[in-house]
Amino acid sequence: MIIWIASYPKSGNTWIRSLLSSYLFSSNGEFSFNLLENIKQFSSRDFSSELKNKELDNQNQIFSNWLPSQRLINKDKKIHILKTHNAMCNINGNNFTDEFNTSAVIYIVRDPRNLITSLAHHYELNLDEAFKFLTNERKIIFPLDENTRNENNKLKDLNFISSWSSHYISWKNIKFCPIKGMMCIF
């Protein structure tokens, strides 16, 4: 089953992953960037043999593979800790996750007044642009380390994040693991 470390971008997900990785995966509790590989970022593309080398024409191909990818991850019946920036959403009938794939959620909340400055620096935006980013109900982000599309204009990956408030509410109102969920607020 999956334990999600979920957050809006620039909220401290990597920091929490660093703490957990040092605690769970090192013999002496010391941090190393190599340890972050133990808590990967969820991408349906990375975990789906069907999607791994396939060229994607539209976003719905990614959304429709969220649950099948999670079922593949959970085939080994082990606990998997995964990072996500996706909102807990349903797009075109495709749920991001469900009670059959999720054991618990660690949701990280960062005050949006602090987050906006971090967003502006990270994405090289002015504060007005960062505010629009933060309040965009249909916001999608793409990996920064790669181009959004490959040389054939096919999608590589994406995260549907929505606005900061909708993202927070989507995970706060999760119904199938409310007791096991944990919220980090800073």
Residue spans for each PLM region:
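PAPS-dependent sulfotransferase catalytic domain
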Residues: M1-M183
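G-domain G4 guanine-recognition motif of GTPases
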Residues: F186
